[in-house]
Each structure stands twice: as structure tokens, then as C-alpha cells.
Curated annotation (Swiss-Prot):
SUPFAM superfamilies: Ribosomal protein L14. Part of the 50S ribosomal subunit. Forms a cluster with proteins L3 and L19. In the 70S ribosome, L14 and L19 interact and together make contacts with the 16S rRNA in bridges B5 and B8. This is Large ribosomal subunit protein uL14. Keywords: Ribonucleoprotein, Ribosomal protein, RNA-binding, rRNA-binding. The keyword Ribonucleoprotein applies. The lineage of its organism: Bacteria, Pseudomonadati, Pseudomonadota, Alphaproteobacteria, Candidatus Pelagibacterales. The keyword Ribonucleoprotein applies. GO terms for cellular component: cytosolic large ribosomal subunit. InterPro entries: Ribosomal_uL14, Ribosomal_uL14_bac-type, Ribosomal_uL14_CS, Ribosomal_uL14_sf. GO terms for molecular function: large ribosomal subunit rRNA binding; structural constituent of ribosome. Belongs to the universal ribosomal protein uL14 family. PANTHER family: 50S/60S RIBOSOMAL PROTEIN L14/L23, LARGE RIBOSOMAL SUBUNIT PROTEIN UL14M.
Length: 122
């Protein structure tokens, strides 16, 4: 569960290391985002030669959450950290590589490009 002011790690090679959620997209009263949801973020920490700079505002798709998600078969998938992948306005990933595992639920959310770049799909 990601809400405003939640800090996340970045799971791609855009150069950003740490980001902060500043808005959850999908309705004016929407409070929380989970895996596959799009959020608006501010870059809090970045590499000097990266594609994004500290303080810049972008959109991102959440790919891992500590809270975990329940599946139809009764299993629960949870991770050690909250992580997101930066995307452009069309929803395409800004980076060319993705680090760490992602979940199958991204497929039903229409994030096929992220799944194809990921090294492991749980």
C-alpha cells in the first residue's frame, strides 16, 4: 500500500535511486496504490549522470510492495521493499532495464513492457 509521502526504491536504470509518492492517480479521493497502479513521484536521490535529476517530477508504476497482495488461489506475495519503475506519459518505461522480480498482476494491468524487461516474474 503506497500513499502520499511514501518513499520507494527505483527498480530500473534511469539513474534515480529513491523517490517519493506525491499523488496516487485514479480518482480525486483515492488514497492508496498497490502493484500495477500509476503514481506521480518526485525524485529524492539520483545518480549524477542519470536520465532523471533530483527534484524532477515523473509518473511511475508500482512493481513491489511490502504489504503484499492476495491471489485467487489463496496465496500471498510480499516483498522486502516498496519499488516502482519510472514511465513516461504514454505509460512506456523510461529505463531500458528492470532490476528485481515483478508480479504477474502487472499483466492484467496492461504493463506488458515492464514484464518483458523484468528478469523474474512471480
Amino acid at each position: 500500500m503506497i500513499q502520499v509521502q511514501t518513499e520507494l526504491l527505483v527498480a530500473d536504470n534511469t539513474g534515480a535511486k529513491r523517490i517519493e509518492c506525491i499523488k496516487v492517480l485514479g480518482g480525486s479521493k483515492r488514497r492508496y496504490a498497490s502493484i500495477g497502479d500509476t503514481i506521480v513521484i518526485a525524485v529524492k536521490e539520483a545518480l549524477p549522470k542519470g536520465k532523471v535529476k533530483k527534484g524532477s517530477v515523473h509518473k511511475a508504476v508500482v512493481v513491489r510492495v511490502k504489504k503484499g497482495i492476495h491471489r485467487e488461489d489463496g496465496s500471498k506475495v510480499r516483498f522486502d521493499n516498496n519499488a516502482a519503475v519510472l514511465v513516461d506519459d504514454k505509460g512506456e518505461p523510461v529505463g531500458t532495464r528492470i532490476f528485481g522480480p515483478v508480479t504477474r498482476e502487472l499483466r492484467s494491468r496492461g504493463q506488458m513492457k515492464i514484464i518483458s524487461l523484468a528478469p523474474e516474474v512471480l
